[in-house]
Structures are given as C-alpha cells and as structure tokens.
Amino acid sequence: MRRPLLATLLALLLAALLGAASPASAAVASDSRSQGVPPELQPPAGQRQVLKALGKGAQIYDCDAATGKWTFREPAAILYQHGKQIGIHYAGPTWELFDGSKVTGAVKVNVPAPHPDRDIPWLLLQATSNAGSGTLSTVDYIQRLFTEGGVAPNGGTCDPASDKSVGVPYTATYAFWSDGQ
C-alpha cells in the first residue's frame, strides 16, 4: 500500500508541534556504548559515532481489514540536535539531514524496550544505501534507542469499519555509526 502523502505530512506536522511543545534538546547521551545499551545492539568494533539525534514524530499504522489488526506502515519524524531541526526520518527506513546526506537501513537486531507495552523496540540497523556528501554519507549502522511511545493502540486491534490509519506519537534517540571509509 502506498502511503498517502497527506498522512505523512500530518505526522510531520504533529512531530513539529510536539517539538515546539517540549524541549527538543532533551538530554541525548554522547555515546551509546556507555549508556546501558544491550550488547547485541552495539555496532561492530571499529565503528565510531558520528551523530546522535532526537527523533520526534509518529509511528504510522494502517488497519488491516482482513485481520482487524494494526500493521506498521512507516515512521514520520523530525530529527533534532541541541534543540535545532537537522533532518527528517521516513519510510525506508530512511534518515535525511538538511546537509543533503541520507542513509537507508535494514533491521539487524530488535530488542524489546524496557516498557514494551507502550514503547517501540530498540533496534540496530545496518545501512543498505547512502547518498550525498554530508554526515550520513558514510554511516554503516544506526541505533534506535530510549524509545517512548509509538506502539499500536488498543493492543494492536482495530475496527476495519471505522479505523483506517493512525499516527502514534513517539520519541527515540538515533545514533549513527561509521568506520570512516
């Protein structure tokens, strides 16, 4: 199913409003290797962290008429560093910075968040493609950590007669890693 442009734009607007309503410069730790991150979510040796950003937005779900369950469609978030918008995060999953660089990744490891009933899982993703010449152009791994929110509503069930899609607010810390090559 193709994502409706309007739903994505609304989710990004929601992310911008959430960012304006609370300090986007919330404490973002400097290096996730020392912040209680499970070992299986650590990037391989030789990687160095090139960026850490706060993502604020929505996890978008569609109601599957056949199963009556919410199915994940895409993320739609704004990326912040030190309170400033630096980029966006969208389907792919892709992270794109205003410096013109972007990275798309695939999930390598998925670990439940400390509160899995309300917070989406923590992830280690491996880059599948890079573009541009900025910060994300050499990224090899992405971590999604310290998530809050984003879980499909109603225990994952939906009513196909009335529910079509929903954006569930979330925040996450994204750490980007590169071997520098």
Where are these regions (language model features)?
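Primary mode marks residue(s) on the alpha4-beta5-alpha5 output face of response regulator receiver
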Residues: 29-60, 67-181
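Secretory targeting and sorting signals
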Residues: 1-26
